[in-house]
UniProtKB/Swiss-Prot annotation:
SUPFAM superfamilies attached to this UniProt entry: Double-stranded DNA-binding domain
Protein name per UniProt: DNA-binding protein MmarC7_1157
GO cellular component: cytosol
GO MF: DNA binding
Amino acid sequence: MNPEEIRQRRLQEMQAKAQEQGAANDPEAQRQAQEQQMQYEMQKQKILRQILSEDARSRLARIKLAKPQFAEQVEMQLIQLAQAGKLPIPLTDEYFKGLLDRIYEMNKPAKKEITIMRR
């Protein structure tokens, strides 16, 4: 099971539990959800520390500051690739840069061209 599937399952479980308790505004349910999110983040950071070299981790941290959504996507893909055994561990900064380029190219929006036809 990949981390994204685990995350989705946990989110569904938390939502179901909140609905069962009728606790849309219950501080206890919010605290539990926040605690589970923190545990998930800690687990993710632990895995990333094992996968990435120090330079690659600092690069990822800078990306996270500039583009949080892109960084989240990169983290998920790194974890999935590492679990599949498709990454050299620890991941060097040079390899990480190449991987970032490939991920960016896959996800960049299609270039829009506007042509003006004159009569």
